[in-house]
């Protein structure tokens, strides 16, 4: 149980942030909010940014989305670029949840690679997905293509899978195959399995059965059990002919 060892007005901003975090971890949300609200930007802009991000997260857990978006919106890039990036990502997710599609795009678009590579990658992935749902395929492709493996391997893998799917709908099979082929198991085993499954069918359509067999054979049970079973069925059917 967390108990402050001195009055709040005698604690530094960092100590109050730590106390707020401890309350949050213990599920004492009201106590966490009360402590975090005492931190001002004039005391320490960096810690203020961290406190507002945490406040937003707490309000989000409580379902108080208006309060959450208000807190995240107070995080300024110049105070703490990485915290700003994640606050903007959370804003985008919340705006999407409540149906503010233009505002989610704006929030995610505020995130730059230099703020946080990982936040940038997941924001670009989310942007791509949103543009896709709006039938803006060119914009979706542009967003997914912005993600590098060294930003975030998992986001890169799923972006490449989505790119391949987009190219397939545009009848650009070579581009689709290139995108799916770029995914490695160590990026994300599940995305890798889906990519190999798609590659198998793409090669089968092109009557490149050796390549199809290789792709399906690459899928392991631990990657994705259902895709593994499907790949084994496909291999059995191909080997019959």
Map each language-model feature to its residues.
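Start-of-helix register in tetratricopeptide repeats
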Residues: 14, 46-50, 86, 122, ...
């Amino acid at each position: 149980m967390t108990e402050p060892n001195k009055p709040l007005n005698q604690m530094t901003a960092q100590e109050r942030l730590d106390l707020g975090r401890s309350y949050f971890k213990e599920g004492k949300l009201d106590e966490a909010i009360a402590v975090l609200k005492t931190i001002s930007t004039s005391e320490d802009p960096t810690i203020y940014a961290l406190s507002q991000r945490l406040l937003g997260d707490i309000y989000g857990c409580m379902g108080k989305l208006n309060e959450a978006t208000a807190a995240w919106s107070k995080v300024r890039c110049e105070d703490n670029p990485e915290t700003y990036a994640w606050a903007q990502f959370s804003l985008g997710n919340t705006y999407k949840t409540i149906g503010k599609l233009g505002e989610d795009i704006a929030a995610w678009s505020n995130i730059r690679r230099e703020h946080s590579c990982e936040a940038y990658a997941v924001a670009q992935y989310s942007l791509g997905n949103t543009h896709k749902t709006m039938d803006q395929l060119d914009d979706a492709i542009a967003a997914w293509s912005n993600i590098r493996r060294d930003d975030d391997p998992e986001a890169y893998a799923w972006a490449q899978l989505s790119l391949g799917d987009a190219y397939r709908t545009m009848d650009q099979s070579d581009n689709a195959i290139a995108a799916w082929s770029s995914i490695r198991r160590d990026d994300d085993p599940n995305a890798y399995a889906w990519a190999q499954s798609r590659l198998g069918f793409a090669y089968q359509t092109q009557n490149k059965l050796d390549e199809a067999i290789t792709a399906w054979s690459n899928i392991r049970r631990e990657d994705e059990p259902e895709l593994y079973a499907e790949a084994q069925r496909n291999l059995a059917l191909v080997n019959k002919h």
